[in-house]
């Protein structure tokens, strides 16, 4: 299941807080957390997402979308 989180228009700190909360409360079925951060007003949130969550323990990998305003966080499955 893909969960979407729209953070564009927020500050980097606000976006980080919402993403952290979303990661803490993921549903068991969720395999992708899709972050909609936008890009037309700068890419500060996108850059933060790609750097901060690349090494997060719940994230297997970070995938860039064909849409520059979206980054997918692929959730690590614990067996």
Describe the residue ranges of each PLM region:
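Long, charged, low-complexity intrinsically disordered regions
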Residues: 1-79
